[in-house]
Structure formats: C-alpha cells, structure tokens
Amino acid sequence: GGDLHSGRWWWCSDRQAATPLASGVHALSNAALNEPWPKVRRLSAALEEALRGDAAALAERLFTLLGERDVAADADLPATGVGIERERLLSPIFITTPDGRYGTRCSTLVLGERDGQSWRLQVIERTHDRRGDSSAERRVTFDRWPQPGHRPAVN
C-alpha cells in the first residue's frame, strides 16, 4: 500500500507484516518482494532503465519487458522444489506452457504522473490467451486523483 501525497509505501503479504519500502525500484514475482530470481533482477534493472527514457514511450517499453520469454540459465534458477524442468518453464518474465493450462494471463501497468497537487493515474492491462497472444487491452485513467483537498487519515 502507499500514500501518493507523502510518498511513503509499504509491502505486506500473507507471510509478512507491513514493512516500509525504501525509495527506488522494487520487483515482484511469485515469492517475496525483490526475491533475487533471474526474472526479478531483470525486471528491476530494466525498469530503472525504462524510467530514464522517453515518458511518451514508457508504457510500450514496459509491456515489451513484461512480454520477455527468455529462459534463465540452469545455474541461475531458484530451487523452489518444483524440479529443474518446471523451474525452466517458470523462469521467463512472461510464462507460457505447452498445454496452455498455466501461464501469464494478463500484464498490468499502473502509471502515475504528478499534476500539481494531485496525480494522473493510468491503469493499462493487456489480457493474453492460452498461447500468450494479446487478446484485449483495457485502459482506465484517473485524472486529478485523489481529488484536491482530500487527505487520507494518518494513524
């Protein structure tokens, strides 16, 4: 969770109480935040690079990143207990399986841009079919969010 006004953000999960996040880039896969899996390291580094580029092309750069299907080298794979073949299958940022029963089903971006005292937030989601092809895109924009004068309760 977080607070756009103060810039404070927290991470929590079913295994960890809310913990304040340091400023910077954080990445998440199916484990703890910033778990040093190859795809998490790749996402973190590429996101930092993407944020330094042209803002107008940011969403497309990020969707390209989320669509990467490179398999990590065996020596870099985590040992999560599913066996080496499954680790290989799960190692790309974008996962597809031969039978199409498991894999990436959507890629979602939440982009924020400060607009005076408020923010313009854009949520863009691409849905993928069983083969991994994009089948739909949805966009929702929140202009001037939160509304000027609104301050969340602070404990």
Predicted regions located by residue number:
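N-terminal nucleophile
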Residues: 1-155
